[in-house]
């Protein structure tokens, strides 16, 4: 039961942060922003937790907070909307989102690893 509470608590924080971003960032960019920031942060946290046993903190931050801050379902819905109007735009959107998020996660991971060595 404790794990459910940790994930739910993180999720409340994450979705609140995402909603805050939705209020101040243009509708066209907000999902790209939250997914890139979330991926970057996930890279940092993955590197941090790699050799540390903090299962509860990891659940709170990764599954709960970042899982609700980032959003694959909204990305999929936006992609479908773009696809119905312009398949070329949809393809570009999918490529930019996917590669940007992967790159952000990688950069976050590398930065954290380099910081640990310093």
Annotate the PLM regions:
Residues 1-118:
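Membrane-interface helix-loop junctions in multi-pass transporters/channels
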């Amino acid at each position: 039961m404790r794990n459910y509470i940790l994930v739910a608590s993180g999720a409340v924080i994450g979705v609140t942060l995402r909603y805050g971003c939705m209020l101040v960032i243009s509708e066209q960019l907000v999902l790209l922003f939250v997914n890139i920031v979330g991926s970057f942060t996930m890279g940092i946290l993955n590197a941090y937790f790699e050799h540390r046993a903090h299962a509860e903190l990891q659940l709170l931050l990764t599954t709960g907070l970042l899982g609700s801050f980032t959003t694959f379902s909204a990305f999929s819905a936006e992609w479908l909307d773009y696809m119905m109007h312009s398949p070329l735009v949809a393809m570009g959107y999918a490529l930019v989102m996917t590669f940007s998020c992967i790159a952000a996660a990688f950069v976050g991971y590398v930065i954290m690893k380099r910081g640990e060595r310093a």
